[in-house]
A protein has these predicted regions:
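Secretory/organelle targeting and membrane-embedding segments
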Residues: 1-165, 169-506
Length: 506
């Protein structure tokens, strides 16, 4: 169904959602309270949702629609990016409904069906429905089957139905395939939106613009000039209250399998024919398919667990001392792996991926490190005085990019030193970047899936990670300890040192 607010001649309004209802399963969870509802409000506040938009919360709380609206106001006041506007909120609240019940309660789904019928009349939703499953994956099958049984999915109505699922997309390749089969047995593949919120970040999308919208980078983006690539996701916090989720998952399953391998795919992919969803996702899938696993998994990986100690001015407890944890747990809070991509462009260029908690600072970045220039003219300088040029894309928190190169130091001597040239979103653009969930929710409502991985991408990611997980699970020892506030265990530094390289200090 076309969007009546979208005029092909008017480029200003080409991303306003049409009529519809967004149904949140698990509306009382942390993600919905802190990210999803504030993002929906921010979209409305920016004029990107129609005035008759509807929101349905589904949860176990015994709430009325007014109770839900009152709670939503508190969540929005606490976490929304844009200023609170009473008129905008009142318009949004008028379309809020709440369904009280368990995820396997047939009566609740009957009430949901009746509510969506009512909204089709009172809010003119056009029977367009997006079901957002902000729930544990163990409930995906039940919810999808109930939606199908109650004719809320694959129904022959004039509108559309889409389903949104959050990571983790399984815990290994077998479970990912099973999950994909379950979801796609109810919803067609093009109606399934797998959320990886990193792909909604401006800097991640800007990576495509930097690579393919400029002439200066792409000629150097290959194994003739690139020495290696480092992709880092560091957090300065511990597991907090996520003990029940994190134990048995670990850093690799939590972020390397999804966020970091997606960043690798975007960094290494060939230029797509267009930004059409199929073209973009096909190029990412080709990269992941070409990832070559190392023969020696131990030499190409490192794991760690943070210990008790001081992080800045704060004394923190170690991972094994966190409440609710098994003191003999083999779950890692830090993981690093070395991968190679078996293509003509990237053959011989290692990609180093690392992620961890309680590290030196919160930062996510992609660093493309170039080979050293020949030291022919500057013969009175030692080779180690010449750094390697690098192009660094900062995903968070200071979104932007940095180029590192050598320059002459002012003075009478020909002395060389590394300097940086910096681009920051906050300095270059007056409008602040929207939150990732704003972009992704809007894309769901518009039916534009380029930023959402297909099941083939998910399965390829697990194909890459599973051998590491199996190798680590067979080790008789726990992951290596590292101090809070450091940059991981010594084994991670040794992983790089074996290749004559070092980790960047973000």
């Amino acid at each position: 169904m076309s969007n009546p607010l979208r005029d092909a001649r008017d480029r200003r309004l080409n991303r306003i959602a049409g009529p519809g209802a967004l149904v949140f399963f698990g509306i009382t969870g942390d993600l919905a309270r802190k990210k999803l509802m504030p993002a929906v409000y921010d979209l409305a506040n920016r004029g990107l949702l129609p005035p008759n938009f509807a929101i349905v919360g589904f949860g176990r709380r015994d709430w009325t629609a007014q109770d839900f609206a009152d709670q939503a106001r508190e969540w929005i006041l606490a976490s929304a990016r844009t200023p609170f506007n009473e008129t905008v909120f009142a318009q949004l609240a008028a379309g809020m409904r709440f369904i009280s019940g368990a995820f396997d309660d047939d009566g609740a789904y009957e009430q949901l069906a009746a509510t969506l019928d009512e909204l089709a009349e009172s809010r003119s939703t056009g029977r367009n429905h997006a079901f957002y499953l902000s729930i544990p994956p163990s409930w995906f099958e039940v919810v999808c089957q109930k939606l199908s049984e109650h004719k809320l999915a694959q129904d022959k109505n004039p509108g559309w139905e889409r389903v949104v699922i959050e990571k983790p997309f399984g815990h290994d390749l077998a479970s990912a395939r099973e999950l994909n089969s379950i979801v796609e047995s109810v919803f067609p593949p093009d109606a399934v939106f797998r959320i990886d919120h990193y792909l909604g970040k401006e800097t991640v999308q800007n990576l495509l613009a930097l690579r393919f919208g400029n002439q200066m980078f792409e000629p150097l983006w290959n194994n003739k000039y690139v020495d290696h690539v480092q992709i880092t996701m560091a957090e300065d916090i511990g597991i907090g209250g996520r003990a029940s989720y994190y134990d048995g998952v670990g850093a690799a399953r939590d972020v390397i399998q999804n966020h970091l391998l997606q960043l690798l795919a975007l960094t290494a992919m060939e230029e797509p024919i267009s930004f059409d969803a199929d073209h973009l996702r096909s190029e990412k899938e080709k990269v992941l398919t070409a990832v070559k696993l190392p023969e020696d998994l131990g030499a190409a990986s490192a794991r760690g667990q943070y210990t008790s100690g001081w992080q800045g001015a704060e004394e923190v407890v170690g991972f094994l001392d966190e409440e609710g944890f098994n003191p003999k747990s083999n779950t890692e809070t830090y993981a690093a792996v070395k991968l190679e991509i078996n293509t003509r462009r990237w053959s011989g260029v290692p990609f180093y991926l690392r992620a961890g908690k309680r590290l030196g600072r919160r930062v996510t970045e992609i660093a493309v490190v170039f080979k050293k220039a020949p030291n022919l003219l500057f013969t009175d300088h030692e080779d180690d005085e010449f750094g390697q040029n690098a192009f660094v894309i900062r995903v968070q928190p200071d979104e932007g990019a940095t180029i590192r190169f050598s320059s002459k130091v002012p003075g009478t001597q020909m002395e060389i030193r590394d300097v940086t040239m910096d681009f920051g979103y906050g300095n270059a653009f007056t409008e602040s970047s929207p939150e990732a969930y704003e972009r992704l929710i809007l894309d769901v409502l518009l039916g534009e899936p380029p930023l959402f991985p297909r099941h083939e991408e998910v399965e390829q990611s697990w194909r890459i990670l599973d051998p590491f997980e199996e190798y680590w699970a067979a080790l008789p020892t726990q992951p290596d300890p590292y101090a809070p506030g450091s940059w991981g265990p010594e084994s991670s530094d040794e992983l790089m040192a074996k290749d004559g390289r070092t980790w960047r200090r973000p």
